[in-house]
Structure formats: structure tokens, C-alpha cells
């Protein structure tokens, strides 16, 4: 055990005397040694919303079996909808407290939210940069009923982390009557589908051992995006902590079915981790300050969040030349995930796909040159090219359509080989005029 758990309960009894009365936000000293109840957590998250409305929104994903709210703290710079370059903010999803007796997992979710909220209020440039470019969605306590009863299961005696609709089976202990038979898990999945379908990181927090585990749990096979997970592993080992175990959950923990991690990756297409923060369970407090005890884990979370931009394929066109019956495309992948089935589309003025290429792949942090058959491509006024690809290799990964700036497109004449910029409306007019003057036949329609 990484903390002195035997003394933890003693200090709780001596220092706090009893659980904090739910009438005010928890004092820092009590918060450092006494784990959250549903009541004290509710007070804390509501105080955040009241005190920091510019960066905190509080919503409920639904209610537990006993009617407790599943609070989600949404954290971002809400004064701006997008990033400064106009692109959408990245999204991160975090949950804690699937197992009510795994309190340090819940506390890590709380500390992660607290770091960015308080950092914003204290003008910390790291927190400010993240919140200007990222939305954090954090369900700190998923199983509030189990938390207050200090029980692993919910009040139906179901293990919520065996109840997701991904390789669910009755062979797992206490997996429920069927996938999503419990309100806590169905609410969590519904929140993912409503708010964070395009998230590029999902971390679910637990205790039981010490590991950062990626998919899969149901099979020993490596995930499709093993390159991404192995890059993250190597980067953390080199720059943060070389001893933190990071591997697939099936081998690193034990085989499991119906978990939120495998659902997040296999159904939602997120890069997912289970963060097992400690082997402690059932204790209600800690002798060591919680922020010190989870300092390394918080540093890992900060790393994962700060670099979320890289946790997908990020295709960037270096050049696009169209002439004759081919498009010569040069594209770089700035992300740490590969994409296996990208295509180039040509969109007409009405927004319809007029032409698309065959598939090509671009490996993580790599470069690809492709010669694409364009014999059926005719350019039209108002048309443009776009890249169509999946953000990761896993089948469930989100598809994206990213327009290519016309300044990157060159049109090659059949006879001279000259390269001209792709036509804007003005360029179309100029090109037609020049064509009339010079009596040149062009290979494409203006």
C-alpha cells in the first residue's frame, strides 16, 4: 500500500471527530484527511459553481438508485465557445467512484477539478491555457449510494463496472440483470453520448492496485491504437515516473467484461485509461494529506489533459496538386494516433460530395504521399477539397471532415506543367479570361 492506511482511520477519528457537517464547504484541513461524502461533495461543487461561474457549470447526469444526483462539473473558459483559432475546444471526460469503497479514486477526480478551477482563479498560466482550449467534464462521484455506504456495489448489489454494454456477461460477479440495468451506468453512458461524443480522453478512477491501464480488459489482445498507448506509456516513464505500471488491463489487472473503460474505447472510440491510484479500499480517511498522497497521479492527469490535442490523428496537408487524372497528395500526421482509412473528398458549391478518392493511411507522427485516381473529378465554382478520416484506428473512432485551405491546392496544366493556385471566384474569372485570350484548352472545367 502506497499510504499509511492503518493510521488513516485513526486520524479521521481524532482530527475530525465525526464526518463533517454538511452546512458549509469543507475546510481544506478536513478535506485533506476526510474523504468526501455525497453531502460534502454536493456542497463543494455547488460552491465552485457559485464562486467561479466564468469557468464552472454544474449539471446532473441523472440520479442514483436512491435519488442522489450524479453531478458533472463542466470546466472551461465559458466566455469563449471555441479556441482562439476558431477551432472547437478539445474535450476530456473523467469519472470517479464507480466502486463506492474506492475513495481515493473519487478524490483524484476531485483534485483534478480543483487544480484547474483554483488555478484559473489564481491566474496560473497552465490552468488558463488548458481552460481556454479544453472542456473538462468530470463526474467526481458516480456511485454516491455506494460511497456513503462504503460499499463496492450499488444498492442493487451490482458491480457498476461490470454493467456496461460491451462484452457484458453473467459470468462476471454481480454484473446485473443485463447491460445498463442500473441507473448509474445508463446515466453515465447517456452523458457520454449527449455531451462528449467527440472527447479525445476518458479516464475512469479507481483503487485496488497501482496502475494506469488501457484497453482491453475482456481480451489479452492489444488495442487497435496500441501505438498511441505505448507512446503515452513511454513519455510518462521518461518524463514523470519510470515506475508507474502502464499496460493493457487484461494483463496488468485481470480479465474483466462490461467495464466503462472498454465501453469508452470500444463503443465511443475514446482513448481510455483506468487509473488505479492505490490498493486502499473501505477506509474513510487518510493520515497523509490527500493532495500529497495523490501528487504523482495528479501530475499524470495534468500531462494527459495538457496534451489531449495529440491523442488522435491530426492530418495536415503539405501539398495537393491536381492535374490530368490524378491528385498528388502529401499529408503529415501531427497526432500520436494513426488513421487507417482516410479519403480525400471534393465538395461542390451545394455542400455535396462530388468525388472521393480511394483509402489511404497515415501512421502516427508520420508522413504519407499518395497518388490518387481523379479521373472522375471535375472542379466546379465554389468547390473545395476536404479530408475525411477517423481520429483513431479503433472502428468506433469518430469520423472528421476537415476542409483544406485553397492556398494549399495547386492545379497543373496538362501541356505546360505550370502550377496555379486553386480557383477562388476571382481566380475563375481571371482564368476564363486568360483562356480566351491565349486560346488554351484546360483539362478541367471552370
Model-flagged regions — what are they?
Residues 1-25, 408-446:
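Secretory targeting signatures
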Residues 53-59, 134, 242, 348-351:
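Short glycine-aromatic motifs
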Residues 72-87, 97:
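Short beta-strand-to-loop junctions in surface cap/lid or active-site-entrance loops
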Amino acid at each position: 500500500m502506497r499510504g499509511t492506511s492503518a493510521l488513516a482511520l485513526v486520524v479521521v477519528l481524532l482530527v475530525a471527530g465525526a464526518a463533517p457537517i454538511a452546512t458549509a464547504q469543507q475546510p481544506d484541513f478536513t478535506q485533506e484527511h476526510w474523504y468526501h461524502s455525497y453531502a460534502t461533495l454536493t456542497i463543494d461543487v455547488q460552491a465552485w459553481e457559485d464562486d467561479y461561474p466564468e469557468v464552472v457549470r454544474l449539471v446532473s447526469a441523472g440520479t442514483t438508485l436512491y435519488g442522489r444526483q450524479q453531478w458533472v462539473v463542466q470546466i472551461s473558459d465559458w466566455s469563449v465557445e471555441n479556441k482562439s483559432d476558431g477551432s472547437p475546444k478539445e474535450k476530456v471526460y473523467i469519472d470517479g467512484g464507480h466502486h463506492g469503497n474506492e475513495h481515493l479514486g473519487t478524490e483524484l477526480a476531485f483534485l483534478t477539478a480543483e487544480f484547474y478551477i483554483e488555478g484559473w482563479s489564481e491566474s496560473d498560466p497552465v490552468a488558463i491555457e488548458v481552460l481556454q482550449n479544453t472542456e473538462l467534464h468530470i463526474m467526481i462521484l458516480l456511485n454516491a449510494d455506494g460511497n456513503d455506504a462504503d460499499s463496492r456495489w450499488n444498492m442493487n448489489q451490482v458491480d457498476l463496472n461490470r454493467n456496461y454494454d460491451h462484452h457484458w456477461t453473467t459470468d462476471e460477479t454481480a454484473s446485473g440483470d443485463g447491460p445498463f440495468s442500473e441507473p448509474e451506468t445508463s446515466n453515465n453512458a447517456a452523458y457520454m453520448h449527449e455531451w462528449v461524443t467527440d472527447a479525445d480522453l476518458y479516464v475512469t478512477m479507481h483503487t485496488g492496485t497501482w496502475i494506469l491501464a488501457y484497453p482491453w480488459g475482456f481480451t489479452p489482445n492489444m488495442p487497435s491504437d496500441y501505438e498511441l498507448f505505448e507512446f503515452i506509456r513511454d513519455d510518462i516513464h521518461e518524463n514523470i515516473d519510470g515506475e508507474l505500471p502502464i499496460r493493457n488491463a487484461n494483463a496488468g489487472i485481470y480479465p474483466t467484461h462490461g467495464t466503462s473503460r472498454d465501453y469508452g474505447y470500444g463503443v465511443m472510440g475514446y482513448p481510455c485509461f483506468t487509473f488505479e491510484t492505490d490498493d486502499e479500499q473501505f477506509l474513510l480517511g487518510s493520515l497523509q494529506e490527500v493532495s500529497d498522497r495523490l501528487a504523482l497521479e495528479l501530475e499524470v492527469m495534468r500531462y494527459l489533459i495538457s496534451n489531449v490535442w495529440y491523442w488522435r490523428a491530426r492530418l495536415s496537408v503539405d501539398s495537393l496538386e491536381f492535374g490530368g487524372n490524378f491528385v498528388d497528395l502529401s499529408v503529415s500526421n501531427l497526432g500520436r494516433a494513426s488513421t487507417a482509412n482516410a479519403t480525400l473528398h471534393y465538395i461542390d458549391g451545394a455542400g455535396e460530395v462530388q468525388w472521393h478518392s480511394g483509402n489511404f493511411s497515415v501512421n502516427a507522427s508520420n508522413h504519407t504521399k499518395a497518388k490518387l485516381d481523379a479521373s472522375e473529378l471535375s472542379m466546379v465554382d465554389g468547390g473545395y477539397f476536404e479530408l475525411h478520416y477517423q481520429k483513431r484506428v479503433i472502428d468506433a473512432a469518430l469520423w472528421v471532415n476537415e476542409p483544406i485551405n485553397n492556398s494549399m491546392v495547386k492545379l497543373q496544366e496538362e501541356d505546360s506543367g505550370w502550377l496555379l493556385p486553386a480557383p477562388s471566384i476571382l481566380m475563375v474569372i481571371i482564368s476564363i479570361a486568360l483562356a480566351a485570350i491565349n486560346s488554351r484548352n484546360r483539362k478541367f472545367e471552370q
